[in-house]
A protein has these predicted regions:
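A short helix->loop->beta-strand "cap" motif at the edges of active sites that frequently abuts
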Residues: 13-15, 72-73, 135-137
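Nucleotide-activated donor-binding/catalytic signature segment of Leloir-type glycosyltransferases, i.e.
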Residues: 89-106
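Active-site-proximal region of nucleotide-activated glycan assembly enzymes
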Residues: 1-26
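A donor-sugar binding/catalytic signature common to diverse glycosyltransferases
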Residues: 107-150
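C-terminal amphipathic helix plus adjacent low-complexity
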Residues: 161, 167-239
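Conserved catalytic-core segment of nucleotide-activated headgroup transferases in glycan assembly
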Residues: 18-93, 153, 188, 192-194
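Short, conserved active-site loop motifs that form the nucleotide-linked donor/cofactor pocket
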Residues: 17, 101-103, 150-151
Length: 239
């Protein structure tokens, strides 16, 4: 995305663009994080999104329960804090309580789960990209933007065969995953956070030298003030 914003920088001239990379990605590309898991049995991570119209949790409950009983896999199920449907939560907690190979994880730190899992089952959650940063395959249920980097299915009964394929890590799929993640984050040196700080220091040191004056944008400012009901001058006169 940097070339696009660099062109805007050249066109408008009142701001600077720095290419830094995504600071959060530093965690995913450290040597310790990139280590492949050593599990006795395949581990499937299921972290569905909370967005109601694309959330797979209501549709896959029965299928996940069936797979937990019939496949030699271990499962880790974890929900976003905003997924609050009590029936869905109770249903998956019941599956975990009745099956020794299923864990229902409640906690904010998902990184250990991403590291431990061999494959992910998901829908359209943003965590998919983070998991693929670890060079691991993802099966999705009715993903909103499917592509060759995903194994996307549209019916619950297709989940099992799709996970078996994912666990085999076919070379074509892994190539697509690597190309996709490289497009989204080419910086793999774990210095994205440092580049952000360097950019801030550089801007402070250079100040506004060489930049044009920012347009007043009075109409936009008025719309924002009206939207936020922010009228400091009127408040002064009222006093």
């Amino acid at each position: 995305s940097t070339p696009y914003f660099k062109e805007l920088e050249r066109q408008y001239g009142f701001f600077r663009v720095y290419e830094t990379g995504w600071p959060k990605a530093d965690t995913y590309f450290s040597p310790e994080t990139q280590l492949r898991p050593r599990n006795d049995r395949p581990v499937i991570l299921y972290p569905p999104t909370f967005t109601r119209n694309v959330c797979s949790a209501p549709h896959l409950m029965k299928e996940i329960e069936l797979l937990a009983k019939t496949k030699p896999w271990d499962w880790i199920i974890t929900f976003h804090p905003k997924l609050t449907d009590p029936d869905i939560i109770a249903g998956y907690k019941r599956i975990a309580a009745e099956n020794d190979n299923v864990t229902f994880f409640e906690g904010p730190d998902k990184m250990p789960l991403l590291q431990r899992a061999d494959a992910m089952l998901c829908d359209s959650s943003s965590i998919i990209l983070e998991f693929m940063f670890l060079d691991k395959p993802v099966v999705t249920f009715r993903n909103s933007h499917p592509g060759p980097h995903l194994i996307d299915v549209d019916r619950p009964e297709k989940v099992g065969p799709a996970l078996e394929r994912a666990l085999s890590r076919p070379e074509e799929l892994m190539r697509e995953i690597r190309a996709y993640t490289m497009h989204h984050e080419p910086h793999r040196d774990c210095r994205c956070s440092a580049r952000v700080l360097d950019a801030v220091d550089d801007y402070i040191a250079r100040g506004h030298a060489g930049l044009k004056r920012k347009p007043l944008n009075l109409i936009r400012k008025w719309k924002l003030r009206r939207q936020m009901r922010y009228y400091p001058l009127l408040e002064m006169f009222r006093r």
